[in-house]
């Protein structure tokens, strides 16, 4: 029996929030791993330290830029799979990646910068709606160009939302009172960043995820806001005072608050008021679910996540 070689993976945006987990997991999983890095990134002390870590994993650094077509094309010609984890300000620049993939003609799979909620199902308000629309546009362009793809839907980053339980500017879970978005009943989904990377790298060579949307829905992590608060209360042996932020309150803040806050709250409205994270079924043949495809992966549960905060 011939063991097929693991694909060569290029990660664009590898020094970003979720990108660094993907670079590490890809390299440690035995994939020849490449990271497209801007030369200016080396001048950032924090990013420079991260790049040294990448080198220790055996990652090949390719200097270039998503807006420089020549460097992009040169990088893409060296690999089999391209994963983009660029931030919101660069979503539209992924058009350049699509053009380069089309010109190179060697890419077996493209994973665009999704790594959030399913934008084809979400009913977001502005300013999140425009952000989601950019992702939708990139999806339709990939499909129109006939580029093989996988869209990765991981829902909430656990380390982003859970440490402060969605309490603005807090660093740890609340001990006295908690603000709950909406009535706290719609379910949402939380996945640890390391697990997101594991499921994603598992999927890159899997024919079952080709031209599919990969949904991450760990059963133990599909919880309502009220259920998470209750879980936390059980851990600390204390009942918290609960303040419910109504839909009207959220909409008012979204209209009047500063932009970063408005965007985050607009996403919270989609997830915690509309229930857009978990209010639909994963529909085959276009949708597949990660924990069903990869049952051997042991994911971190929300319950386990909070043990370190007790």
Curated annotation (Swiss-Prot):
SUPFAM superfamilies according to UniProt: NAD(P)-binding Rossmann-fold domains
Record: residues binding NADP(+): 13-19, 38, 47, 139
Enzyme Commission numbers on file: 1.3.1.-
Gene Ontology MF, one: oxidoreductase activity
Tissue: Expressed in roots.
Pathway: Alkaloid biosynthesis; nicotine biosynthesis
Active site: 135
Inducing or repressing factors: Induced by methyl jasmonate in roots. Down-regulated by auxin. Accumulates upon the removal of flower heads and young leaves.
CDD domains, per database record: PCBER_SDR_a
Main localisation: cytoplasm
A GO BP entry: nicotine biosynthetic process
Magnesium recorded as keyword: no
GO cellular component: cytoplasm
Alphabetic keyword roster: Alkaloid metabolism, Cytoplasm, NADP, Oxidoreductase
Pfam families reported for this sequence: NmrA (PF05368)
Cellular localisation: Cytoplasm
Subunit organization: Monomer.
Protein task: Involved in the biosynthesis of pyridine alkaloid natural products, leading mainly to the production of anabasine, anatabine, nicotine and nornicotine, effective deterrents against herbivores with antiparasitic and pesticide properties (neurotoxins); nornicotine serves as the precursor in the synthesis of the carcinogen compound N'-nitrosonornicotine (NNN). Probable NADPH-dependent oxidoreductase that binds NADPH in vitro. Does not seem to be involved in the NADPH-dependent reduction of phenylcoumaran benzylic ethers.
Additional note from the record: Root cells silencing A622 exhibit inhibition of cell growth, severely decreased formation of several alkaloids, and accumulation of nicotinic acid beta-N-glucoside and N-methylpyrrolinium cation.
Protein name: Isoflavone reductase homolog A622
Phylogenetic placement of the source organism: Eukaryota, Viridiplantae, Streptophyta, Embryophyta, Tracheophyta
């Amino acid at each position: 029996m011939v063991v097929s070689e693991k694909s060569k993976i290029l990660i664009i945006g590898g020094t970003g929030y979720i990108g660094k987990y993907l670079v590490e997991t890809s390299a440690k999983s035995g994939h020849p791993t490449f990271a497209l890095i801007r030369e200016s990134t080396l001048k950032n002390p924090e990013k420079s330290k991260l790049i040294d870590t990448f080198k220790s994993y055996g990652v090949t650094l390719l200097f270039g830029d998503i807006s420089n077509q020549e460097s992009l094309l040169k990088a893409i010609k060296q690999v089999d799979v391209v994963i983009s984890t660029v931030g919101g300000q660069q979503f539209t620049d992924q058009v350049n990646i699509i053009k380069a993939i089309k010109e190179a003609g060697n890419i077996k799979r493209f994973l665009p910068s999704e790594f959030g909620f399913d934008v084809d199902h979400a009913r977001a308000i502005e300013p999140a709606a425009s952000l989601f629309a950019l992702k939708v546009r990139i999806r339709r362009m990939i499909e129109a160009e006939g580029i093989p793809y996988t869209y990765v839907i991981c829902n909430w980053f656990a380390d982003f939302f859970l440490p402060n339980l969605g309490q603005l500017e807090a660093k740890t879970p609340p001990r006295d009172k908690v603000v709950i978005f909406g009535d706290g009943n719609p379910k949402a989904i939380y996945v640890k960043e390391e697990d997101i990377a594991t499921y994603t790298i598992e999927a890159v060579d899997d024919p079952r995820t080709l031209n599919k949307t990969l949904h991450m829905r760990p059963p133990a992590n599909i919880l309502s806001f009220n259920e998470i608060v209750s879980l936390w209360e059980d851990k600390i042996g204390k009942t918290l005072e609960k303040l419910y932020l109504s839909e009207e309150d959220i909409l008012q803040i979204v209209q009047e608050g500063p932009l970063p806050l408005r965007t985050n709250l607009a996403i919270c409205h989609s997830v915690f008021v509309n229930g857009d994270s978990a209010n639909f079924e994963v529909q085959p043949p276009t949708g597949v679910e990660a924990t069903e495809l990869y049952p051997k992966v042991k994911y971190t549960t929300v319950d386990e996540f909070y043990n370190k905060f007790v």
